[in-house]
Protein backbone atom coordinates (compact mmCIF):
# COMPACT_ATOMS: atom_id res chain seq x y z
CA UNK A 1 0.00 0.00 0.00
CA UNK A 2 1.37 3.42 -0.88
CA UNK A 3 1.99 6.09 1.75
CA UNK A 4 -0.88 8.15 0.38
CA UNK A 5 -3.25 5.20 0.72
CA UNK A 6 -2.05 4.62 4.28
CA UNK A 7 -2.61 8.24 5.23
CA UNK A 8 -6.05 8.29 3.61
CA UNK A 9 -7.03 5.08 5.40
CA UNK A 10 -5.86 6.48 8.72
CA UNK A 11 -7.73 9.74 8.16
CA UNK A 12 -10.86 7.89 7.06
CA UNK A 13 -10.86 5.64 10.13
CA UNK A 14 -10.22 8.49 12.58
CA UNK A 15 -12.74 10.70 10.79
CA UNK A 16 -15.49 8.13 10.86
CA UNK A 17 -14.80 7.36 14.55
CA UNK A 18 -15.07 11.05 15.36
CA UNK A 19 -18.23 11.47 13.27
CA UNK A 20 -19.84 8.44 14.88
CA UNK A 21 -19.05 9.72 18.36
CA UNK A 22 -20.14 13.32 17.79
CA UNK A 23 -23.43 12.46 16.10
CA UNK A 24 -24.22 9.91 18.80
CA UNK A 25 -24.76 7.23 16.17
CA UNK A 26 -23.25 4.62 18.49
CA UNK A 27 -25.82 5.38 21.14
CA UNK A 28 -23.22 6.03 23.84
CA UNK A 29 -24.16 8.53 26.52
CA UNK A 30 -20.94 10.51 26.96
CA UNK A 31 -20.79 13.06 29.78
CA UNK A 32 -21.46 16.60 28.53
CA UNK A 33 -17.91 17.86 29.18
CA UNK A 34 -16.49 15.00 27.04
CA UNK A 35 -18.87 15.89 24.22
CA UNK A 36 -17.75 19.51 24.53
CA UNK A 37 -14.11 18.43 24.10
CA UNK A 38 -14.90 16.00 21.29
CA UNK A 39 -16.55 18.09 18.62
CA UNK A 40 -13.75 20.67 18.01
CA UNK A 41 -11.13 17.89 18.03
CA UNK A 42 -10.25 17.91 14.27
CA UNK A 43 -9.74 21.69 14.36
CA UNK A 44 -7.65 21.26 17.52
CA UNK A 45 -5.42 18.62 15.92
CA UNK A 46 -4.92 20.81 12.84
CA UNK A 47 -4.01 23.85 14.91
CA UNK A 48 -1.58 21.87 17.09
CA UNK A 49 0.04 20.35 14.00
CA UNK A 50 0.45 23.87 12.61
CA UNK A 51 1.91 25.12 15.89
CA UNK A 52 4.34 22.19 15.99
CA UNK A 53 5.46 22.92 12.41
CA UNK A 54 5.90 26.63 13.15
CA UNK A 55 7.80 25.95 16.37
CA UNK A 56 10.10 23.39 14.73
CA UNK A 57 10.91 25.76 11.87
CA UNK A 58 11.62 28.58 14.32
CA UNK A 59 13.80 26.37 16.52
CA UNK A 60 15.83 25.07 13.58
CA UNK A 61 16.31 28.63 12.30
CA UNK A 62 17.53 29.76 15.72
CA UNK A 63 19.94 26.83 16.23
CA UNK A 64 21.33 26.61 12.70
CA UNK A 65 25.14 26.68 12.80
CA UNK A 66 26.52 29.67 10.93
CA UNK A 67 29.88 29.25 9.19
CA UNK A 68 31.28 32.81 9.15
CA UNK A 69 34.59 31.87 7.48
CA UNK A 70 32.94 29.81 4.77
CA UNK A 71 30.47 32.63 4.07
CA UNK A 72 33.24 35.19 3.69
CA UNK A 73 35.26 32.83 1.49
CA UNK A 74 32.21 32.22 -0.69
CA UNK A 75 31.55 35.96 -1.10
CA UNK A 76 35.15 36.62 -2.15
CA UNK A 77 34.98 33.72 -4.61
CA UNK A 78 31.80 35.19 -6.08
CA UNK A 79 33.53 38.58 -6.54
CA UNK A 80 36.46 36.84 -8.18
CA UNK A 81 34.19 34.93 -10.55
CA UNK A 82 32.25 38.06 -11.50
CA UNK A 83 35.46 39.97 -12.26
CA UNK A 84 36.80 37.06 -14.30
CA UNK A 85 33.62 36.66 -16.36
CA UNK A 86 33.31 40.43 -16.90
CA UNK A 87 36.86 40.45 -18.19
CA UNK A 88 36.00 37.67 -20.63
CA UNK A 89 33.15 39.70 -21.97
CA UNK A 90 30.03 38.39 -20.19
CA UNK A 91 27.64 41.22 -19.40
CA UNK A 92 25.60 41.02 -16.19
CA UNK B 1 24.56 28.77 16.71
CA UNK B 2 22.86 31.23 14.38
CA UNK B 3 23.46 34.89 15.10
CA UNK B 4 21.61 38.18 15.26
CA UNK B 5 18.26 38.44 13.57
CA UNK B 6 18.15 34.70 12.81
CA UNK B 7 18.11 33.87 16.49
CA UNK B 8 15.56 36.56 17.30
CA UNK B 9 13.20 35.50 14.52
CA UNK B 10 13.59 31.81 15.32
CA UNK B 11 12.96 32.19 19.04
CA UNK B 12 10.10 34.56 18.26
CA UNK B 13 8.46 31.89 16.13
CA UNK B 14 8.93 29.31 18.89
CA UNK B 15 7.39 31.68 21.46
CA UNK B 16 4.42 32.49 19.21
CA UNK B 17 3.73 28.83 18.51
CA UNK B 18 3.90 27.97 22.24
CA UNK B 19 1.55 30.81 23.16
CA UNK B 20 -0.98 29.82 20.52
CA UNK B 21 -0.72 26.16 21.49
CA UNK B 22 -1.24 26.70 25.23
CA UNK B 23 -4.11 29.15 24.77
CA UNK B 24 -5.86 26.91 22.26
CA UNK B 25 -5.32 23.78 24.40
CA UNK B 26 -6.75 25.55 27.44
CA UNK B 27 -9.69 26.75 25.34
CA UNK B 28 -10.60 23.42 23.72
CA UNK B 29 -9.44 20.77 26.20
CA UNK B 30 -9.39 22.27 29.69
CA UNK B 31 -12.28 24.74 29.76
CA UNK B 32 -15.17 22.21 29.55
CA UNK B 33 -13.90 20.61 32.76
CA UNK B 34 -13.80 23.88 34.69
CA UNK B 35 -16.89 24.98 36.57
CA UNK B 36 -18.81 27.49 34.43
CA UNK B 37 -18.88 30.05 37.27
CA UNK B 38 -15.08 30.24 37.47
CA UNK B 39 -13.54 33.61 36.60
CA UNK B 40 -11.19 32.11 33.98
CA UNK B 41 -14.04 31.82 31.47
CA UNK B 42 -13.88 35.60 31.16
CA UNK B 43 -10.61 35.29 29.21
CA UNK B 44 -11.98 32.99 26.51
CA UNK B 45 -14.45 33.63 23.70
CA UNK B 46 -17.52 31.39 23.22
CA UNK B 47 -16.53 27.91 22.09
CA UNK B 48 -17.93 28.27 18.58
CA UNK B 49 -15.05 30.65 17.83
CA UNK B 50 -12.57 27.86 18.62
CA UNK B 51 -13.45 26.30 15.26
CA UNK B 52 -14.54 29.45 13.38
CA UNK B 53 -11.30 31.40 13.86
CA UNK B 54 -8.87 28.66 12.68
CA UNK B 55 -11.22 27.92 9.77
CA UNK B 56 -11.29 31.58 8.70
CA UNK B 57 -7.50 31.81 9.13
CA UNK B 58 -7.03 28.69 6.98
CA UNK B 59 -9.25 30.10 4.24
CA UNK B 60 -7.32 33.39 4.34
CA UNK B 61 -4.08 31.45 4.03
CA UNK B 62 -5.41 29.58 0.99
CA UNK B 63 -6.51 32.91 -0.50
CA UNK B 64 -3.05 34.42 -0.11
CA UNK B 65 -1.35 31.33 -1.53
CA UNK B 66 -3.70 31.44 -4.54
CA UNK B 67 -3.11 35.16 -5.07
CA UNK B 68 0.66 34.67 -4.86
CA UNK B 69 0.58 31.83 -7.41
CA UNK B 70 -1.60 33.95 -9.73
CA UNK B 71 0.80 36.88 -9.41
CA UNK B 72 3.86 34.75 -10.17
CA UNK B 73 2.19 33.10 -13.15
CA UNK B 74 1.06 36.43 -14.62
CA UNK B 75 4.53 37.91 -14.13
CA UNK B 76 6.26 34.97 -15.86
CA UNK B 77 3.72 35.13 -18.70
CA UNK B 78 4.47 38.83 -19.18
CA UNK B 79 8.22 38.12 -19.21
CA UNK B 80 7.91 35.41 -21.90
CA UNK B 81 5.64 37.67 -23.96
CA UNK B 82 8.22 40.46 -23.78
CA UNK B 83 11.08 38.22 -24.99
CA UNK B 84 9.05 36.86 -27.93
From Swiss-Prot, chain A:
Chief location of this protein within or outside the cell: endoplasmic reticulum
Keyword Transmembrane: yes
Record pathway: Protein modification; protein glycosylation
Domain of life: Eukaryota
Topological type in the membrane: Multi-pass membrane protein
Biological processes, Gene Ontology terms: dolichol metabolic process; GPI anchor biosynthetic process; protein glycosylation; regulation of protein stability
InterPro entries attached to this UniProt entry: DPM3
Record keywords: Endoplasmic reticulum, Membrane, Transmembrane, Transmembrane helix
Subcellular location: Endoplasmic reticulum membrane
Molecular-function GO terms, alphabetical: enzyme activator activity
Spans through the membrane: 8-28, 37-57
GO cellular component labels: dolichol-phosphate-mannose synthase complex; endoplasmic reticulum membrane
Family (UniProt): Belongs to the DPM3 family.
Job description of the protein: Stabilizer subunit of the dolichol-phosphate mannose (DPM) synthase complex; tethers catalytic subunit DPM1 to the endoplasmic reticulum.
Assembly information from the UniProt record: Component of the dolichol-phosphate mannose (DPM) synthase complex composed of DPM1, DPM2 and DPM3; within the complex, associates with DPM1 via its C-terminal domain and with DPM2 via its N-terminal portion. This interaction stabilizes DPM1 protein.
Protein name as annotated: Dolichol-phosphate mannosyltransferase subunit 3
Lineage: Eukaryota, Metazoa, Chordata, Craniata, Vertebrata
Name of the gene encoding the protein in the UniProt record: DPM3
Amino acid sequence: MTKLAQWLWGLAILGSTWAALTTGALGLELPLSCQEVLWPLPAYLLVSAGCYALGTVGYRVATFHDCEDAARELQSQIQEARADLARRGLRF
Amino acid sequence: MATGTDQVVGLGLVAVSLIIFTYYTAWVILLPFIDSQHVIHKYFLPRAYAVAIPLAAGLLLLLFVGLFITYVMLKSERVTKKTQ
